[in-house]
Swiss-Prot record:
Source organism of the structure: Nitrobacter winogradskyi (strain ATCC 25391 / DSM 10237 / CIP 104748 / NCIMB 11846 / Nb-255)
UniProt entry keywords in alphabetical sequence: Ribonucleoprotein, Ribosomal protein, RNA-binding, rRNA-binding
Lineage: Bacteria, Pseudomonadati, Pseudomonadota, Alphaproteobacteria, Hyphomicrobiales
PANTHER family per UniProt: MITOCHONDRIAL 28S RIBOSOMAL PROTEIN S6, SMALL RIBOSOMAL SUBUNIT PROTEIN BS6M
InterPro entries, A to Z: Ribosomal_bS6, Ribosomal_bS6_sf, Ribosomal_S6_plastid/chlpt, Transl_elong_EF1B/ribsomal_bS6
Any one Gene Ontology molecular-function term assigned to this protein's record: structural constituent of ribosome
Protein name: Small ribosomal subunit protein bS6
Family membership noted in the UniProt record: Belongs to the bacterial ribosomal protein bS6 family.
């Protein structure tokens, strides 16, 4: 069966519990039509590049799907109807990535940077006083 990566964006006003319910609803549709969800990742609330339907932020969710094309048609139809879904995108892939997706790796990398101390530079001493410019002597 073909493999798909499906990402949908839910309104920021929706609680994380509502997003989880929406994810389980979509997963139920997929399994009901003979497919299976191999991986589900909730990327959390992220800022959007531009406003979509009066929203500046959204919940991002990734689903790796293994199933026929009729599944994609049905979940996209249901997401078009659902008021909490802002956008969705389904891409056919040759194979699914093992381990975390690129977005999750980026989030882990950002957390590691925060562990390094952020912007605190306590090891540096105080600033040196500015030197006065040399006096110009005119003859």
């Amino acid at each position: 069966m073909p493999l798909y990566e499906h990402v949908f964006l839910a309104r920021q006003d929706a609680s994380s519990q509502q997003v989880e319910e929406l994810t389980t609803q979509i997963t139920g549709v997929i399994t009901g039509l003979g497919g299976k969800v191999t991986k589900t990742e909730n990327w959390g609330v992220r800022s959007l590049t531009y406003r979509m339907k009066k929203n500046r932020k959204a919940h991002f969710v990734l689903l790796n799907i293994d199933g026929p094309a009729t599944i994609v048609n049905e979940i996209e139809r249901q997401e078009r109807i659902h008021e909490d879904v802002i956008r969705y995108l389904t891409v056919r892939v040759d194979e699914h990535e093992d381990g975390p997706s690129a977005m999750m790796r980026k989030a882990d990398r950002d957390r590691e940077r925060d562990d390094r101390g952020g912007g605190f530079r306590g090891d540096r001493g105080p600033r040196r006083p500015r030197e006065e410019p040399a006096a110009v002597v005119e003859e």
